[in-house]
């Protein structure tokens, strides 16, 4: 069994939750080793004038 570390991040994007998750993964790649998995914990969004302006994804990223 190979141990993994887990970091928690919030990714954000104006283009959707998938892009928000990818933004978190991209940020994690800057400091983490090999990323082996992502757990999406929560989705939220910012709203202005009745329109979604930013999608946010709280994620846990497993890495070696």
Regions found by a protein language model. Give the residues of each.
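A cross-kingdom feature marking charged/low-complexity
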Residues: 39, 43-64
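A generic structural signal for short, solvent-exposed coil/turn residues
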Residues: 1, 32, 49-53
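Short, well-ordered alpha-helical segments
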Residues: 2-36
């Amino acid at each position: 069994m190979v141990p993994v570390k887990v970091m928690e991040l919030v990714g954000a994007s104006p283009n959707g939750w998938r892009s928000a998750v990818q933004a978190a993964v991209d940020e994690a790649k800057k400091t983490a080793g090999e990323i082996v998995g992502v757990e999406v914990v929560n989705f939220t969004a910012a709203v202005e004038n009745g329109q979604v302006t930013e999608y946010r994804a709280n994620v846990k990223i497993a890495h070696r």
